[in-house]
């Protein structure tokens, strides 16, 4: 599978909104690039679990997202620029936050800075002294490495999409206690 196909598989929203119909090329102005409801309806593949209201909602989301400014910004991107996909990954994850990872850990934020992805976790029930201990840090690094270096195809794509690594930030209340940066090189 080539890199572009694999990247598309990473973000489910791309499947839902994709449609590369070269037959309807306009003259490049904002009016000719506006997406109509009929265009979107023909591009969507109905999932048996989706209700008509869900489709209408998605169509309205797509139309609202298709402003002349956003279309212009999209057209200015280079074909191989991963910025838009990186931003999409962050945006999709943010929609699902906060996420309770386990009894003591809540994922509260994610972000990207170039080729680096960052997680923000808030912990409860673990003292700062425990989190600052070498035993805890070693255990966390081992868990992160096992997860980050998984052979799962999605994680392989994730590492390619964020080649400068992933930063894991652990907070106790509002105080940053522990940070670990996983780089793709730890997986070799």
UniProtKB/Swiss-Prot annotation:
Keywords associated with the record: Plasmid
Something else known: Plasmid Clo DF13 originates from Enterobacter cloacae but is stably maintained in and studied mostly from E.coli.
Protein name stated in the entry: Protein K
Species: Escherichia coli
